[in-house]
Amino acid sequence: MSRCLSVVALSLLAVLPTLALAYQAEPPRAPLQVLRVDRYTDDANAGSLRWAITTANAAPGRYRIEIDAVGVAPYVIRPASPLPEIKGPVQIIGTSWARDGQYIAIDGSAYVTGTGTDACPGAEPGQSGTNVRTTTLPGLVLRDTQGVELVGLEIRNFCIGVLVNRSSHNEIHDNRIVANKGGAGIMLTGDDGKGQSTATTTMHNRIVRNEFLDNGDGLELTRGAAWNLVADNLFQSTPANPEPSQGIEILWGNDNSVVRNRFVDYSDGLQINWGNRNYIAANTFTGNSIGLSITGSGNVVDGNTITGNGIGIGVRPQPVSAPNRFTANRIYGNGLLIERCEAGGACMKGQPRGAIVFGVPGLEHASFVGSRGRGVDNDPSKRAHICTAAGQADCQPLPNLGQAAPQLTAVQGKGAQRQLNGRFKGVPDSHYQVEVFGNRATNGREAEWVLGSVEARTDAQGQGSFTFPLGTGADAAAAGSLTATVTSAQGATSPLSAPLSLR
């Protein structure tokens, strides 16, 4: 037996070197050659940014472009005409940022001229500005490439700050993106050049730790952009912004992750237009007309703080009602009269406001009030109508599969035995999740903090009931009122229930 084991052991030892070779780490890469930008004059001579990009494009993967701080701050390069498109792999680094936090600015004002958003024409004649199809006058262009890294730059005063078109595996981090007044601060799009989506061309890009200030749209994920990460950024608009549209717009973009960002003072903090399975988590939305405006299917809004907006989450109708999930969000202090409606927002007379509102009109609806984009046909007869009840014809149905809010009926018991009872309606013989929230005020109608969740089922008639243990925990004890949502097995979350006062 010992001899047999020794033979086996020797055989394993013989093949281990081969296995190790098969799984060894990637060999070290050759060091990159540095192209140093130490002149801010826009010409083709050595030392200029234009020269550096042109040189790097001739041998992708060989170079790192380092832009030095020349003279005294602020450090500004003003191209006189569009720069060459960037071919990766390549790094473009503003060197002063890592040293003292100063950005090197690339400023488009020398050739992007005109009044306001009229300086940025769209792809269709007569249209201009944000929220019309455009790839006009971008600052830095990543098209049909990969492996580009941008860091330590301030990119400002273009129509699009950075255009990422049919490009993947790029990283844009630790930059300032300022006052790009047409398409977006950063636009990630699979646009095929004719307005159609391409499904696998704009993937696995990372947009992290940037500051987006006073862009029309801060960032766009459109026309097939998928599996991209947008994390730890600030998206902010101020009164200086002529067209404060969206912090982020997702249009026909799927499976993107948007996490730990801040969205401040836009028409919509984030707007999803027929995008699917996007994951929106741990963000903060404040001061927006609508915090999140949503269509599409399978999107998850999870663990966000949504406070001080007109509407917290606005769920828009679409031709076929589809499920979207809202879970573990803190939603409070909304319902403000913020009428900022540049291709989004809530300005319709009598518009309901609050934490979660179904049936909010968007640009696609006849009842929308606001700008659909400069030069866009506003004829309401060409727009969709919203159904006000189930079973109506010639209108778009209630969103989120029409899932109705639960009803909270009573709190029973004392101390550790205290429990919340409620009921809801849904699909017969189906599984549901009920999520319960606490509010400080006795008439609090939002979701100030999460108390927990409980599973429930419907019977053959679609009637469901639930019991949620409140116990003696501090969160439950501090609540002056309770609210709840119910989410179906398909992932369709209801609006919040009417509050149940505890005092």
Model-found features: residue ranges?
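Bacterial N-terminal signal peptides that target proteins for export
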Residues: M1-A9
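Bacterial N-terminal signal peptides
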Residues: V8-P17
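N-terminal, post-signal-peptide segments of secreted/periplasmic proteins
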Residues: Y23-G161, R166-E171, N324-A477, T483-S488, ...
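Right-handed parallel beta-helix
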Residues: D107-E249
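Edge beta-strands of extracellular beta-sandwich domains
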Residues: G491-R503
